[in-house]
Amino acid sequence: MSIPFSSRAVARCAAASMALAGIAAAAPPSSPGATQKALARESCDGLRRAVAHDQGGATSGPLFLTSYRPANAQGEPPFEPALAGAAFTYDNALAGIALLACGDRAAARRIGDAVVRAVAHDQTTPDGRVRNAYRAGPVTEEKPALPGRWDAGRKQWIADAYQVSTATGNVAWAALLLLNLHQAEPTPAYLATARRLLAWTEQNTRARNGPDGYNGGRHGWDNAQRAQTWKSTEHNLDIAMAAAWTARAVRAEGQPDAAEQRQARTALDFVGRMWNPSEQRFHIGTREDGATVSTEGSGLDAQLWPLLAAPEGSCAWVRSLDWVEKHHRSGAGYGFSREPDGIWTEGSAQAAATLVARKGAAPEALWQLLASQRAGNGLYYATPSARISTGLAIGPDSTGADFFYYRWPHLGATAWIALAATGFNPFTGKTAASEVPSCPA
């Protein structure tokens, strides 16, 4: 999930319900229906249109894509200036993987090349990190520019602290993009950069207090960055999958893989410790102390991604889909948080992807919901509502739960829809249903 911005800086439901409840075994994939096929075509077209829009006249070379691009349609709230021209790393990683699923390797590599350059040539700290966001467009400079804007009235440069920070999950997703690209077309720079990103998380976010794992990353301006001391189930799942994949890739090339194997085990062990067997669901992670498990909240992605990624031992977790159905259902789709206040398009697409992986198909109602969110510019709205909440804070300076999604066309939502509709698993680089093991009923 990408965090958009700081508020301070600024009759089908039953069918879908039956599809989620009680899933215990993977089924052979069924043939996609007409809606799913159309959604695959249209979401892939939306991603290609995003590339064409943001590249300007540069038809080759590294490229970052804008995360939120208003369609200026009725029902869209006023756009937040802090998001104008911001290319969130998570959204771009997803878009690159989805472009691979759409058969557009050349466009996917342009995003991967931008990530490689960003890691090698950070604006101030070339230590192997990526920032949470960059300036969208062709990357023509040696050091990719960070987002921001000139405020003529104040006569000062305005930037966003979250956007220039480094969240652990975003680092892992950048690595997953490069691993998908390397698998599609072996490229030494992609694998080497993925290893460097994972090394950064080991050196900078490993936290052995409480349940051993990886904390949230680093937040703030370069001269005053501080650790995000909480640990996230989702972030650790991302690291576990990226590290395990990297270990396999370097081992295949005859290189030592012990570091990545250890990292994968550490992160996956953390995910396993967040499983609540009595409630049959995952906790979202820990509190700020990095040790106390946060038991109240529930994040949709934290429930779904372990099932889509399907690491060894994941059969014990399949019943979390019952929790999702009971506590994340919103209309024909699903919301971000427990007892949600609206549909989260991206998360609803994640549910579709998980159903395709675990059951071989997702319900028609869900595909139709996703299709209904297409904006005039080809991207898909982050939510059908004007605004939905997540129950989470953006950073340590937040005074409350200030992380929201708004009804703006969103690159990340579009990418997840493309992944779900094409049946492509971003955690493995393969067709989802062919990779997920069957589980005993």
Where are these regions (language model features)?
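Bacterial N-terminal signal peptides that target proteins for export
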Residues: S2-A14
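Bacterial N-terminal signal peptides
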Residues: R12-G22
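Low-complexity, Ser/Thr/Pro/Gly-enriched N-terminal "stalk/linker" regions
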Residues: A27-V164, G169, P188-L191, R195-Q225, ...
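Well-ordered alpha-helical scaffold segments within catalytic/enzyme domains
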Residues: S31-G33, D91-A107, W173-T187, D238-Q255, ...
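Alpha-helical positions within canonical tetratricopeptide repeat
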Residues: A106-R110, A189, T193, P256-A259, ...
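Long, repeat-rich segments with strong aromatic
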Residues: T292-A361
